[in-house]
Amino acid sequence: METNGSFSGARLVDGKWIIPESRRKDGSVRRERAVKPGYTAPEDIKRYRPGRGNFASLEKQMKKLQLSNDASTSKSIDRPPISELEKEKLERPLSNKKKEKNDHKAESLKHDYDSVGEKRISKDSVKHLDKTYSSIDSKKDFKYNFPKTQAPEWRRGAKPLSKTSEPSVYSEKMSKRENKKSINTVDKKTGYKEKE
């Protein structure tokens, strides 16, 4: 039993709605699949078309992608040929001042490097190295101020808490509280409620 459905080309086959295998507009193949009544395939839904344009938003995005791919190709192909004036500017000789500057730079580079290609050490750079090494040496004797040395003397002399069998202050207070019945006041030192 086969009847044509009203949605996305679906047909009723043996009590199930099935969209048969078909080709989409873009050329891809849609597999045969079972669907519920009222199903509309995404390809069959009309796309939003903006008021001014005549392309759907997806089509516009595809065009933008194509344009960006075209722009990524080399730009030298699109560049117009060099005019005669530009050629003349490129061929003009350098002025005397520019020539002197270029020659001076070349000479200074020659002086900086030996014939082997290693860079010479100038007197200024040696002085700079001496300063850095002296500052490093002076920092070797530096003592860091750890919290132990920064604490006041009365605190440095305090004994650390010992783990002995003696009951602590906290456990004594707890035993006193257990003996008392009502909870009325708060101890100002500990913040615990005391029983009276």
Curated annotation (Swiss-Prot):
Residues 21-53, 65-196 are annotated as: Disordered. SUPFAM superfamilies: Pym (Within the bgcn gene intron protein, WIBG), N-terminal domain. Residues 21-35, 84-94, 100-143, 173-196 have a biased composition (Basic and acidic residues). GO terms for cellular component: cytoplasm; cytosol; exon-exon junction complex. GO terms for molecular function: RNA binding. GO terms for biological process: exon-exon junction complex disassembly; nuclear-transcribed mRNA catabolic process, nonsense-mediated decay. Residues 66-75 have a biased composition (Polar residues). It holds the Pfam family Mago-bind. This is Uncharacterized protein C19C7.01. It comes from Schizosaccharomyces pombe (strain 972 / ATCC 24843).
